[in-house]
Amino acid sequence: MKGRKDTPTLRVNTNEALTFTYKKKTFSGFKGDTVASALFAGGIRMFSRSLKYHRPRGLYSLDGECSNTCMDVNGIPNVNTEKTLLQNGMHVTAQNVKGSPELDALGFLDSLDRLMPAGFYYRTMHKPARVWPIALQQVRKAAGLGKISPDFRMSGNFDEIFPSTDVCVIGGGPSGMAAAVAAAETGLRVILLEARPWLGGFFDYRQSNFSQGVPHYQRAQELEARLRALPYIRVFAHSAMVGAYSNNLFTAFQIGGENDPFDVRYLEIRAQSTVVATG
């Protein structure tokens, strides 16, 4: 295990070790790690290969905003490991590679990039006509990243709720928390959605001073304490909004924690008004 640095904003509990498998080897991480951070700390730098040219891909956004670290986790393809919390006994597999991300047999496609510009399949392989059905099968095989096993059976506890509220705040950073507090203090019912497992936004990890010697992360903690003390606010952390519709209808999916009775929960929220505070 490499690269662990103790900081006031660290959310990894180094006293609780977890193990998982990758490339038929056992790796270790800690509670609070994501799958990607545990792999990186274990020395893994290459997580996948790009769709078309099979170019190497590694950590980029560190917040689940890219597909570089999409992997197969416990038989489920295209799992974004940058935002998937590590659990004991996970089985992680690379996808879109022939071999491994480090030694991909299809890596030679990168040297053929000039022969495969954008949309090349619309202009080539159509003459003679009998060639296209054969080429189409190969293009289909090359498309996509993960593969769904026909033998896979989904397991777990799934839930759905349909709450209504006066104000729906999307984003649990400093602006979102401040907006939720301001609305709740007037007596309005508030629902707060945050995609990360915790609140704070970009204040959460900043140790520089906010004002009067108070660091940003401490300011975020103070805002969260005020927010959670108010009875009219419902907080849905680890809940990514996936749809916004007319009449202030919002849908989201929430990932359950170890103390929740569900693994994944579908949220369908009706709101009178909305505050978008996504940064």
How should each PLM-predicted stretch be described?
Residues M1-G279:
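Residues forming the flavin
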